[in-house]
Each structure stands twice: as structure tokens, then as C-alpha cells.
């Protein structure tokens, strides 16, 4: 299922306005990390490998809302860490809805049942629940047994209550195409409002460095997997152009300014994955980052992205 029509129209109008202004670089999705703390230690995550003094910090609701206004991206992805561990997450979500931004609240779902009826049911809010495979694979990736069952039950309950729900699915090296195929078939009856797919991006600080896809392997994997997606077999929330890109049938230049990252450390240079320093403001990020030095053709650190 593609994104809702109103969301597509708003984003399309935003992009058109930027082009009319002659704006070459502009944000589409604010990656907002109100905290780095988490209740899991996933094998592929480099975000929670921070010193305790950083893990104990939270962004305030005002800081989150000011950052959204400052960059003015139409979409906000609230990540972390586990956002539901933030003591004021509801206030943050409600504030972003008042700004009429489309929000993807990323969560491992361990705490989600405590927020049903508290998080607003709104066309501006999507619950993006991490599901990276069937039970054995998912629980291995998050390094804790029982998480898969909680996540699946949370999907079912959230849909019954009227929330918009998607899966955030990352495939790691070691997952076969057949396993991914079986997993995507499993998701169909859950009634998700779409499935988002990616390969595991390399975090230098992640505890497990052996299970990241390289660029070539990513393309081979998705070419075979998506070749099985006949007649809309799976409800994938991506444009055909992105799916062609995943398969290596199309190439794009890197546009890290399109997904600026704001956290307790500031505006991260250049993107969510690479940490080459921080700016104090969005304007400083845009003005002082050497954007041309990034991308898989220009920088070895970006080679497998």
C-alpha cells in the first residue's frame, strides 16, 4: 500500500514549492532521536553504544518541536533508542500533530500496550513496529526471546483500535530469500498498512559487524526477493523507483540533507548513519557540511549504503 493520498499530496506540494523557489537541497524526513536509551540491545544497532551520560539525556518537547519547525520537513521519523521510554513522548507526538507533520513512531513494541488510548489515533501518526523476521530470527536479532510475540500481538491490538500501523523490516546477512518470502507471507493477514523494507545498514559501533549486507549482496538479495512479488503479493510501502533501486536496476546520488538527524547531541553530520560531528542549528548543518564528499561513489564510509 502506498502512503495515504493526503500525505502524498502534501509531500508533492512541498517538493514542488522547493523547486519553484530554486532550492537545490531541502529536507523531506526529519530523523528525530529524543533519546538513545533502549530496552533492547539489537545486534545491528550502533545507537545505544553511547556513554551513560549521553544515554541518560532526553530532548525536551520544546527542543523536538523547535527542530521540526527549524528544518520544516513534512515528515518526522521518531527513532532512538526506544521512543516510548521518553517520559514526554505523548506530548512530543501531540505537538508534531499540531504542526501537521506526518509522524512515523518507531518502536520495538515492548511498551506499546501501555500507550494504547494515550497516543492519539490520527491520520498524522503511524506506528512503525520493528519486525525483522519470523520468531527465531527476530528474537535473535533483538537478542531477547519473546519479543516477536509481543510485537505481533501489538500489531493486532493497534489495528483493532484504529491506529495506522506499518512494519519496519530490516534484513541481515544470513537471512535467505526463502526465509524473507515466508516472513512477508506471514505479515499479510496482520492487516498492516504497509511494510517498509531495507537491508541492514552498517553501524561502526554495532556489537555484531558480521551480518551487514554489502551493496552488491543487497541488490542480489532484493532482485530475487522482489521478483516473487507478483500481482501485489506483499503490501510494500515503497515507490516502484525505490524498489528498482534496491535491486540495482537504478542508481541515485546520495542526498543526506533529505534526512537530517537531530538528537541530544545536536544536528548530526552528515546523516543518521555517519557521525562526522554535530551542528548547533539546522542552518549550520546545511551551510557547513561538505555534502559533495559523501555518497557511495565519493566516500569509502558510504560504499555499502
PLM ranges: what are they?
Residues 17-21, 245-250, 291-292:
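Short, P/G- and charge-enriched loop/turn segments at secondary-structure junctions
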Residues 57-60, 99, 128-132, 140-259, ...:
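Radical SAM enzyme [4Fe-4S]-AdoMet core and its adjacent flexible, acidic
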Amino acid at each position: 500500500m502506498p502512503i495515504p493520498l493526503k500525505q502524498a499530496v502534501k509531500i508533492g506540494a512541498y517538493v514542488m514549492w522547493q523547486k519553484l523557489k530554486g532550492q537545490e537541497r531541502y529536507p523531506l524526513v526529519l530523523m528525530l532521536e529524543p533519546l538513545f536509551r533502549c530496552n533492547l540491545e539489537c545486534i545491528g544497532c550502533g545507537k545505544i553504544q553511547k556513554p551513560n551520560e549521553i544515554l541518560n539525556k532526553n530532548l525536551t518537547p520544546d527542543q523536538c518541536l523547535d527542530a521540526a519547525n527549524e528544518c520544516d520537513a513534512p515528515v518526522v521519523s521518531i527513532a532512538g533508542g526506544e521512543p516510548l521510554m521518553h517520559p514526554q513522548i505523548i506530548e512530543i507526538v501531540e505537538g508534531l500533530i499540531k504542526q501537521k507533520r506526518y509522524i512515523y513512531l518507531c518502536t520495538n513494541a515492548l511498551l506499546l500496550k501501555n500507550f494504547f488510548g494515550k497516543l492519539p489515533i490520527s491520520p498524522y501518526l503511524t506506528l512503525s513496529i520493528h519486525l525483522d523476521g519470523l520468531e527465531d530470527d527476530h528474537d535473535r536479532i533483538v537478542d531477547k526471546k519473546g519479543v516477536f510475540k509481543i510485537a505481533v500481538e501489538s500489531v493486532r491490538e493497534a489495528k483493532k483500535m484504529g491506529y495506522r500501523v506499518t512494519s519496519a523490516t530490516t534484513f541481515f546477512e544470513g537471512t535467505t530469500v526463502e526465509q524473507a518470502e515466508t516472513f512477508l507471507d506471514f505479515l499479510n493477514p496482520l492487516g498492516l498498512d504497509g511494510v517498509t523494507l531495507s537491508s541492514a545498514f552498517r553501524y561502526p559501533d554495532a556489537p555484531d559487524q558480521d551480518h551487514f549486507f554489502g551493496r552488491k549482496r543487497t541488490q542480489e538479495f532484493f532482485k530475487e526477493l522482489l521478483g516473487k512479488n507478483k500481482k501485489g503479493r506483499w503490501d510494500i510501502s515503497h515507490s516502484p523507483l525505490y524498489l528498482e533501486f534496491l535491486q540495482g536496476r537504478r542508481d541515485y546520488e546520495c542526498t543526506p540533507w533529505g534526512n537530517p538527524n537531530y538528537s541530544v547531541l545536536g544536528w548530526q553530520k552528515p546523516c543518521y548513519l555517519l557521525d562526522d560531528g554535530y551542528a548547533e542549528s539546522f542552518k549550520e548543518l546545511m551551510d557547513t557540511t561538505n555534502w559533495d564528499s559523501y555518497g557511495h561513489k565519493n566516500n569509502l564510509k558510504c560504499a555499502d549504503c
